[in-house]
């Protein structure tokens, strides 16, 4: 069935960062890339506005072809090469955050993550690359920079160069049912976000505070578009919701689960509820004056400073960071409800 340009633009506008239009066009690798990067940080999604006609034409041509081009090498694309390097670094950073505690992380997990990121970009559209050679380049480069986070960059560059040298057109395959494609994409999405969610659940309060601030700042960008903001919130918290549904509350250590619950509330209601939580942390009632907020903050910082609690450093650090975050929230001028500024 021929793909329509108007339908593609509609899906691009409604669910572009989630890759709905690519799913419609049969570009599953591109859809997965957009799911994992939220449309290339939004920039790739916007840039595609002018590329959609060529994507639709390419999808319709593929339906009419009976065999893929043989002996023809796709043209070299600097944009694809740059995207391979960037996504490889991105996958490596995610692995560094979520899997760095693994034994032989710099030998196995890091090059595998970077190589898969490079291969994902290489498989966008009607092109692909050699799986073994690309991963082989990543694994051969990794020991040279063993134990150094900077290893992500040379591994990504080496894998990207190899992927470009081995680039080729995809072989034509019979179309698969949508349910099978969605199942495969869902597994890939969970494989990427699962370790990251687990690390966030079991990591220190510093990581939780950083993630909360990042999510809150990101969601604030969508304050002008409530529906889109709720969609982004749903996507960001989807791994947590799935994990909680499967594991239940018994699957978490109680103290860390309570910390994540606070983070969840922080993100889920990032304006009014965020301030209410900040008041609770500082032990104040809602509507306290700036002087009361500052006084409570100074008193609690003295009590919970890690240098003053050497016998319970971890708990002191958690409270100290919560107090710092709460004070920053309450120090910001409150936006009136319904305001557009």
Swiss-Prot record:
Transmembrane spans: 5-25, 30-50, 81-101, 105-125, 135-155, 185-205, 218-238
Q: Report how it sits in the membrane.
A: Multi-pass membrane protein
**Which residue numbers delimit the J domain?**
277-341
- Keyword annotations for this protein? Chaperone, Membrane, Transmembrane, Transmembrane helix
Pfam families for the chain: DnaJ (PF00226), TM2 (PF05154)
Compartments annotated for it: namely: Membrane
Q: Which InterPro entries match?
A: DnaJ_domain, J_dom_sf, TM2
Extract the Gene3D superfamilies matched here: DnaJ domain (1.10.287.110)
Q: Name one GO cellular component term.
A: membrane
The residue ranges of the TM2 domain are: 3-50
Question: Which coarse location class describes where this protein primarily resides?
Answer: membrane
Q: What role is this protein assigned?
A: May function as a co-chaperone.
Quote the protein name from its UniProt record. DnaJ homolog subfamily C member 22
Recorded source organism is: Pongo abelii (Sumatran orangutan)
């Amino acid at each position: 069935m021929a793909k329509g340009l108007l339908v593609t633009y509609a899906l691009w506008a409604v669910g572009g960062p989630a890759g709905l239009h690519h799913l419609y066009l049969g570009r599953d690798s591109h859809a997965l890339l957009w799911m994992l990067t939220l449309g290339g940080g939004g920039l790739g999604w916007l840039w595609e506005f002018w590329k959609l006609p060529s994507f639709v034409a390419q999808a319709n041509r593929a339906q009419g072809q009976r065999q893929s081009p043989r002996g023809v090498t796709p043209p070299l694309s600097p944009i694809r090469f740059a995207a391979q390097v960037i996504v490889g670094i991105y996958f490596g950073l995610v692995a560094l955050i979520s899997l760095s505690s693994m034994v032989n992380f710099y030998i196995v997990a890091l090059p595998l993550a970077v190589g898969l990121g490079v291969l994902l970009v290489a498989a966008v559209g009607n092109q692909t690359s050699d799986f073994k050679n690309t991963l082989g380049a990543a694994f051969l480069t990794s020991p040279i920079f063993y134990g150094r986070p900077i290893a992500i960059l040379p591994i990504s560059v080496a894998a990207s160069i190899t992927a470009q040298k081995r680039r080729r057109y995809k072989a034509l395959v019979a179309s698969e049912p949508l349910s099978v494609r969605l199942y495969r994409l869902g597994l890939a999405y969970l494989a990427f976000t699962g370790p990251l969610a687990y690390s966030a659940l079991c990591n220190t309060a510093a990581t939780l505070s950083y993630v909360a601030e990042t999510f809150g700042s990101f969601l604030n960008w969508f304050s002008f578009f409530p529906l889109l903001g709720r969609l982004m919130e749903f996507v960001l918290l989807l791994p947590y919701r799935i994990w909680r549904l499967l594991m239940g509350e018994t699957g978490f250590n109680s103290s860390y689960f309570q910390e994540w619950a606070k983070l969840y509330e922080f993100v889920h209601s990032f304006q009014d509820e965020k301030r209410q939580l900040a008041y609770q942390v500082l032990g104040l009632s809602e509507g306290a004056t700036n002087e009361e907020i500052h006084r409570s903050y100074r008193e609690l910082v003295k009590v919970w400073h890690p240098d003053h609690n050497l016998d319970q450093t971890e708990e002191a650090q958690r409270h100290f960071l919560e107090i710092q975050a709460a004070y920053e929230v309450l120090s910001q001028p409150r936006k009136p409800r319904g305001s557009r500024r």
